[in-house]
């Protein structure tokens, strides 16, 4: 196979991997954590994965501490946790 063909194949495989949803067995453990505002008093719109509803939901993050199930965008949450 030519180097151009190999590059095309590599590009297609990379695209496929990026578009394939996360399966529950590949989902990071922190996706199972509850939403956690944290102790600070800021008001930041953030997203967390809700395993019971199997979707990412918005919540208000206080700005500090909390846990790893905390994403700035719904897209980031869905790429990481949603199946």
Swiss-Prot record:
GO CC terms of this entry: extracellular space
Residue ranges occupied by any BPTI/Kunitz inhibitor domain in the UniProt entry: 31-81
Alphabetical list of InterPro entries matching this protein: Kunitz_BPTI, Kunitz_BPTI_sf, Prtase_inh_Kunz-CS, TFPI/VKTCI-like
Alphabetical keyword list: Disulfide bond, Protease inhibitor, Secreted, Serine protease inhibitor, Signal, Toxin
Disulfide bonds listed in the record: 31-81, 40-64, 56-77
SUPFAM superfamilies assigned: BPTI-like (SSF57362)
Signal peptide: 1-24
Coiled coil: none
Record-linked Pfam families: Kunitz_BPTI
Residue numbers marked as site, Reactive bond for trypsin: 41-42
GO molecular function: serine-type endopeptidase inhibitor activity; toxin activity
Free-text tissue specificity from the UniProt record: Expressed by the venom gland.
Protein localization: Secreted
Protein purpose: Serine protease inhibitor.
UniProt record similarity statement: Belongs to the venom Kunitz-type family.
Protein name: Kunitz-type serine protease inhibitor carinatin-1
